[in-house]
Amino acid sequence: AQMAAGNRNGLAQSIFQVGGNGGSAIGPLLAAVLVLPFGQHAIAWFALAAMLASATLFRVGTWYKGELHRFTKKAQAVNSRVAQFSKRKINIALALLVVLVFSKAFYMSSMTSYFTFFLIDKFGVTVRVSQLCLFAFLTAVAIGTVVGGHLGDRYGRKYIIWGSILGAAPFTLLLPYLNFPLTILTAIVIGLVISSAFSAILVYATELKPGRVGMVAGLFFGLSFGLGGIGSAFF
């Protein structure tokens, strides 16, 4: 994503992430439309989309191979700017970013796993309605990711990160005490706000560790998201 970004790393990162977020959002909708009426065997049709994605990924890999040398030079230029900071400061900053992503992943995993059960238990809605509500929340997450990436490039990533952290807190505290329409509306706002900083955090991390995209991806997509999922199981 960053190879194709030009000077808009935040937007490129957000577009990359919205693929996963968009898939997560469509999942509950497809479950309500296909799996509930037709059974689990309907999932087999999704293999066609996976085959198409594999073919697309092969083409992207060919392009990636040709661009790798140019991107390495760009990473070296970024590395010269980061060199003014000590290794200790860089590692502390990276650890803070990991904690931020972990907290967001923890909340997202909790909402994805339990939001439908919360709606069914508190408001007595059907499984189909609860899945559609989860779809609305996850769609807001996908939209917030793209908007946050664009705003981070335009106004600065630091402001987006702080706004995402502090902006979601009051809505999160209000969520258990609202009626059904306001609960859904508030969940959508939370999804928009809490996801807006994902791309900004990841771009910051790749700038702190230029040329170490694999390590950064492992820390933020693997470790943080994995720990967030494990943490949500205890609540």
Where does each model-flagged region fall?
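Extracytoplasmic gate region of multi-pass secondary transporters
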Residues: 91-135
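Structural signature of the two symmetry-related core transmembrane helices
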Residues: 159-173
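Flexible cytoplasmic inter-helical loops of multi-pass small-molecule transporters
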Residues: 46, 59-83
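Cytoplasmic helix-loop-helix junction between adjacent transmembrane helices
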Residues: 1-19
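A late C-terminal transmembrane helix in Major Facilitator Superfamily
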Residues: 211-235
